[in-house]
Amino acid sequence: MKKYIILAFTAMLPLAAAAQQEEEATENGIVSVDGTKGFTITSKKGDFVFKPYALIQTTANFNYYDDEGLDKAYNQDNVANTGFAIPYAVLGFTGKAFGRVTFNLTMNAAASGGNLLQQAWFDVKLKEQFAIKVGKFKTPFTHAYLTTLGETLLPQVPTSLTATTIMPHTLNAVTPAIGTGFDLGVEIHGLLAKKFGYEVGIFNGTGASVNTATKTFSDDWHIPSLLYSARLTWMPKGVMPSTQGNPNRLHEDKMLFGLSVSENVESESESTNDFRAGFEFSMLKDRWYVGAEAYYMHVGFTKRQKIDDTFNYWGAYAQAGYFVTNQLQLAARYDFMDRNSTGKDGLLNMPAVGVNYFFPNTNLKLQAMYQYIGRTGHATQLDRDNDDLGQPMHTAKVLLQYTF
């Protein structure tokens, strides 16, 4: 049944609806580059725009891991993945050509392999209601990922989106996370009546680290083994800026409600078919920012795996930020995840607090956060120990960011 739904979904691409981020000539998803930042080369008519930009982040990290039930005789290190890091050293340029084609190319020097090319896309806007975007860019799923990278409330996205899921099968290749992030593909999108946005896309489904065509046809469904994704939003007060805190936007009154779905056909080394769905809410009201999301993932194995089990996972979070002064923003988040599937008892609950300081007239931003990962409702101590494997119980992070 699912394969017919996906085929119908693909055939109806021009008619589908899903969420839209604010479209500007300098939109890039990394930093806000409005006319007050950096410099821009513009033609006299304004139909050609070229704008370079940069984002540099340096972090100091402390992570404390639970013993996970191991005896002290193993002499395991509780403190790991601690020290300094550069998660992003981004250099890119964005712009507009012929008055209707926007483009963006971004390299992340802090990454390796295929992740070096963070983004590379062009977007042909035929009219406000219809545009075509091609290349490597953010997939239309979750407010947390679609927020401008340099304007997130906390220096890491919710763990419920990034943590790999747990299932009782020894298939090392099958460790899907709920979040999808960057990918290669094509999407159509537009804005209807200044309030309704849509994005519908087809992607490789292999993530940001792969820049080549590696997919095949599904043996079970006989359709291309790709990621089919769509997102629909309603913005009752006009287009919602893709920010979770910007000192230049302290008088906004915007709101967004969104729904998204996707199916990754023969993902995880052709082992599974992964269905995802999500609901999101975000709001900017003067000095307040509020965001909340809930998402679900269904994992079913391909016939070649000869595994009849299916697994369902979900996660959710709510977060808020408030500018106490024009430069100081306080932040809090509560994150939940059913990491070991709905078939087993137990949840991860992850409260976090943070503070952000924006240095005036410098484009410098200082962020600090603390997160605790708790475990509740597990049937056995072994389940409790396994549920947060690879995840730190205590996380403290300080991030200094410069944008240009």
Segments from the language model and where they lie:
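Outer membrane beta-barrel
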Residues: 39-65, 69-208, 224-239, 319-331, ...
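Outer-membrane beta-barrel "beta-signal"
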Residues: 227-239, 359, 364, 388-404
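N-terminal periplasmic/intermembrane-space "pro-region" immediately following the signal or transit peptide
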Residues: 4-11, 15-57, 193-195, 404
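Gram-negative outer-membrane beta-barrel proteins
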Residues: 60-66, 111-115, 140-144, 206-210, ...
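Outer membrane beta-barrel transmembrane domains
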Residues: 319-321, 325-375
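Detector for outer-membrane/organellar transmembrane beta-barrel domains
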Residues: 231-340
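Transmembrane beta-barrel architecture of outer membranes
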Residues: 88, 117-119, 183-185, 225-229, ...
